[in-house]
Amino acid sequence: NILAGIKVDTGAKELAGFKNEKITEGLDGLRERLLDYHKLGARFAKWRAVITIDETIPSDACILGNAHALARYASLCQESGLVPIVEPEVLMNGNHTIETCYEISKRVLNTVFEQLCMYRVVLEGIVLKPNMVISGLGCPEQANVDKVSEMTFKCLMENVPSEVPGIAFLSGGQSSDLATAHLLRMNEKYSDQMPWNLTFSYGRALQNDALKAWNGSDREAGQKALYHRACGNSFATHGKSLTHS
């Protein structure tokens, strides 16, 4: 079955007083909007927070402000009968190492779940959509697939409660191949240790191959490329490679 959902935040805006940091807005009138969306058939919603890594950021204020907004959104969703997708994204932009990404992702997830619990969000009724723990795009030393899977799994195990039923990764600017490979390796190595299901909620990493193959005119090639990439990611959620199935 296919269920309809809707993005309900109004975007990430400049956080006043905090240079180069953003806060996601959209809480005003959200209760009424969610009730309307549910009547129209929506069964889940999405709210994205973005966290930037640089020498002096993210600040505690940015992390807490975004976590607070995510928690209030999630609480209102559950009140309205919608499943909230909780998306705290630590951006890949920057020169930071994978170790720095791990430390920041840990802070973000810990704060998000503190706020979710404070606002009495039922963790069994959410989907977490986090970033993977990965090197910054400008980092001269790019972590390999094994390192990414190891540190991402470690970060999740330390900070995501077992009550959460599912984790659907965002791709966040990874290549299509790497996004699939990272998901595959985590499910290959750690599936017997995980209390939650690991799956994907990719945008660019799912669509890029299809857009290149389509090239504005070749509909059949685009469809085949999309199907192939979707199958590869689907297999990866079960710890299986499409090429060895």
Language-model regions, residue ranges each:
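Acidic (Asp/Glu)-rich catalytic clusters
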Residues: 1-5, 34-42, 75-79, 118-121, ...
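Short beta-strand segments at enzyme active-site cores
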Residues: 44-49, 81-91, 121-131
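Hydrophobic alpha-helical segments and helix pairs
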Residues: 39-50, 66, 70
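Active-site capping/gating regions of soluble enzymes
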Residues: 96-245
